[in-house]
Regions:
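A structural signal for short loop-to-beta-strand junctions that line the ligand-binding cleft
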Residues: 67-72, 90-121, 137, 147-150
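Ligand-binding pocket segment of bilobal, Venus flytrap-like solute-binding proteins
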Residues: 164, 169-238
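Short beta-strand->loop
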Residues: 23-26, 89-96, 107, 110-112, 123-125, 131, 137-140, 224-246, ...
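A bilobed periplasmic-binding-protein/Venus flytrap-type ligand-binding module shared by bacterial periplasmic
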Residues: 120-127, 163, 247-260, 279-282
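Early extracytoplasmic/lumenal segment of secretory-pathway proteins
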Residues: 17-82, 333
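Periplasmic-binding protein-like
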Residues: 146-154, 270-294
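An extracytoplasmic/periplasmic, membrane-proximal ligand-sensing/linker region
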Residues: 173, 285-333
Length: 333
């Protein structure tokens, strides 16, 4: 038993307390297996509250100082920044976390990234078999008129991408880009990322944006229809010659009023351990937050190595309101 514990939790002393309250926006069965391992190795039982990010934020606001939450996990830098701005995180106190997690994925000692994903472009192979597409800016090209599909402008995935563009390209250039992309839309924005991939495969759209793990999920699917979709599209890692592809995170921190802060810190340290980072990649097709982790996911590996944008997640998050205002002014629904 000790050897198993050492594998996952090097240099960590087991807590005497037996409970941890987790508020999480993640809903994957592979995560639950990770939680079971943590409980088995520490004796700390995880009480999980799972809901959408906004619902969790509303619940935390309603509960106030009486909240039982110990750890908060949210998807996307925009949502994490909102939680930080609302005062829902306390300061992290862990040298291990600060030494392990790259500074790009830390925010004011309040929260850290746990996994990463890329905002990639998917293209209909038949419609654009050899068209060279290199950047997010290319989405605004006139040749893609009535071809582009996307999520709603209010979705954090869109807000984070546009936030990064404002930082990298300036607000006026980004506003001009957004206006031209709106003119290229094939339909009113709707649906999730998987819906965009399906629309590109069907020919309803010629080109779209998606988070990388949605594509890998289809690549790994045992459903023949999903695999047929994958055969009809190709993907592009944008901005390889400039800033690098936009990266985002799922992240977490210790709740402001955590009744079990030691357990919360122990849990976050567990989530950034080498083995758990491998399990995240294997289970939900996300890249590890830490470097030099061997992936046990051939489809994720098949996306290849690529240049990543180096922007701080905290900086991306705090620009989201400006991004929303810009998209509204551009007419992006």
């Amino acid at each position: 038993m000790f050897l198993t514990i050492a594998l996952f939790l090097p240099s960590i002393v087991l807590s005497n307390a037996q409970e941890l309250n987790l508020y999480t926006a993640r809903h994957y069965s592979s995560d639950k297996e990770i939680y079971r391992i943590f409980t088995k190795q520490t004796g700390i039982k995880i009480r999980e509250v799972t809901s959408k990010d906004q619902a969790l934020l509303e619940r935390l606001k309603s509960e106030g100082s009486a909240s039982p939450a110990d750890v908060i996990i949210l998807a996307d830098a925009a949502r994490l920044w909102r939680a930080e701005n609302l005062g829902f995180f306390q300061n992290l106190d862990s040298n291990k976390i600060f030494k392990t997690v790259p500074k790009q994925f830390q925010s004011n000692n309040k929260w850290i990234g746990l996994t990463t994903r890329a905002r990639i472009i998917v293209v209909n192979k038949r419609r654009y078999p050899s068209k060279k597409i290199e950047s997010y800016n290319d989405l605004a090209n006139l040749e893609f008129k009535n071809q582009f599909c996307s999520r709603s402008s209010t979705h954090p995935y869109m807000l984070s991408l546009v936030s990064s563009m404002i930082i990298n390209n300036g607000i006026e250039n980004t506003k001009d880009w957004a206006k031209r992309v709106v003119l290229n839309q094939a339909r009113t924005p709707r649906g999730g990322d998987t819906d965009q991939i399906r629309a590109v495969a069907s020919g309803e759209c010629g080109i779209a944006l998606t988070n990388s793990y949605y594509l890998v999920r289809l690549m790994r699917s045992s459903n023949p229809r999903d695999r047929a979709i994958v055969k009809k599209v190709r993907f592009v890692m944008p901005n390889q010659k400039t800033t690098g592809t936009h990266i985002n995170v799922t992240g977490g921190g210790v709740a402001k009023h955590s009744p079990n802060p030691k357990n919360a810190k122990l849990f976050l340290e567990f989530l950034i351990s080498k083995k758990v980072q491998q399990l995240f990649a294997k289970g939900n097709n996300e890249w590890p937050i830490i470097k030099n982790i061997e992936l046990e996911n051939s489809k994720l590996t098949s996306l290849g190595k690529f240049r990543r944008d180096k922007l701080s997640m905290g900086e991306i998050g705090k620009n989201q309101f400006g991004a929303q205002k810009l998209l509204d002014s551009a007419g992006w629904k």
